[in-house]
């Protein structure tokens, strides 16, 4: 796995024990590490990456929850082959509690589904954003890692959610349209005084070398016009078997763990595990709810 991080690092069992907190039903001040996945356009494979990396982190012994914030076009539940009874819609409407919308999937990670085909969720007002902030804090108190699947594009709720994460994973691919739209999101993030580190994953690439070259193009533009350095997380080559898969099949890391795509996904999960460890050893002063409320006031 090519990365700007130390390629020789691997999680030791002792370090993993440091990552794990007290049991989920115990009180603890330290909250989950928040990693938000964004993209400039749909179709980059953002949800595919989010769900498979959640499984990869779970396989490493971490307690993981996926929060599908792609409201109205949510599909994380499909990729995790889950049929949740309730979604974030029910929570934001005050109909259900966080416990009722939280679902345990068959593959390990927990899930809060986003709700699909619901236009009222496409643009949340300040009140509902505040409710979302409180929900994220409740989840962050129970898990080690919180993965947020944000809607593609520049919608305010997506930008706010990206800005409250400890790390942003920007998902793109070698297509010009995907790179152009990814840069638009990055440029918008660059205008904010307080912003997370931005990691880039080049998905659906013919080779890892093409993935690296694609990143360098995006990084060069970002440095020149947005004065924002980007970090290369890695590339995910598209194995020939991927394009023939159906939604009814198990996630890639479970169904085909030895294929080239899964090998790349596993490597990325290892890097996210490292991010989680580093954040847990140097926690910030504000919880995720406070960070989001501050962004809502600024936006």
Predicted ranges, named:
Residues 252-299:
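NTP-binding/hydrolysis catalytic cores, primarily Walker-type P-loop NTPases
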Residues 138-142, 155-177:
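Inter-motif core of Ras-like GTPase G domains
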Residues 1-43, 62, 100:
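Extreme N-terminal, non-catalytic leader segments
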Residues 226-253, 265:
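Beta-strand-loop-alpha "switch" segments that mediate conformational coupling across diverse proteins
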Residues 179-194:
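Conserved C-terminal guanine-recognition region of P-loop GTPase G domains, centered on the G4
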Residues 40, 173-174, 198-213, 235-242, ...:
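G-domain G4 guanine-recognition motif of GTPases
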